[in-house]
Amino acid sequence: EIYTDHGILTADERITADLEQVFMFLAGEIEEPETQHLLVAPFTLRKGLKRLIKDEAKAAKQGLPSGITLKLNALEDTKMIRALYDASGDGVPMEIILRGICRLLQGVPGQSETISVRSIIDRYLEHPRIYRFHSGGEDRMYLASADWMKRNLSRRVEVAIPVYDPEVKRQLAKLLDIQLADNQKARSIEADGTNPYLRNDEAPLRAQAVFRDF
């Protein structure tokens, strides 16, 4: 029995063709990877994420459904935090699940009223990064290597891979929903520096225990 982080095994040529570009870059055969689907740092990842955030903000301003869910180890990059604050100002609801560093302040009037940040620290050391955007009901989802830190987005080679398979997307969405429903180990990361447990009257749910038997 193995408990591990998320991975994806695919023969989708949209992804494999882009990965070939990444490996050619790493091998020194080309100066910059040219990708159509993968977001690759330090070249297109930051720009692509900002575009996805702006698309959600545009939908919210038009009164259309919108939303962002992020699962990260760390959220430190000031430019990305500003982009999330701007989207919150436009009314985009956001759920952020973090394990470590967080420089974003949730629930600040006029700044981050639509943003909720929680941390789950339990038996297993998690490292998955998932980016989820409502995208007009398309539910665009990425598995990624990068935390939202300046070093990851600007100084390292990192990759965010779009998830196209509907069943894989369904499974990842379920895993996110389980963590968002955790009422045993989840803590709210408050703007005042406190981190109280998130309790409610629902049946006890400990996300990592559910994951173990998933």
Q: What are these model-derived regions, one by one?
A:
Residues 1-2, 9-16, 30-31, 42-214:
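PLD/PLD-like phosphodiesterase catalytic module centered on the HKD motif
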Residues 8-10, 15-26, 37:
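Metal-dependent catalytic core segments for phosphate chemistry
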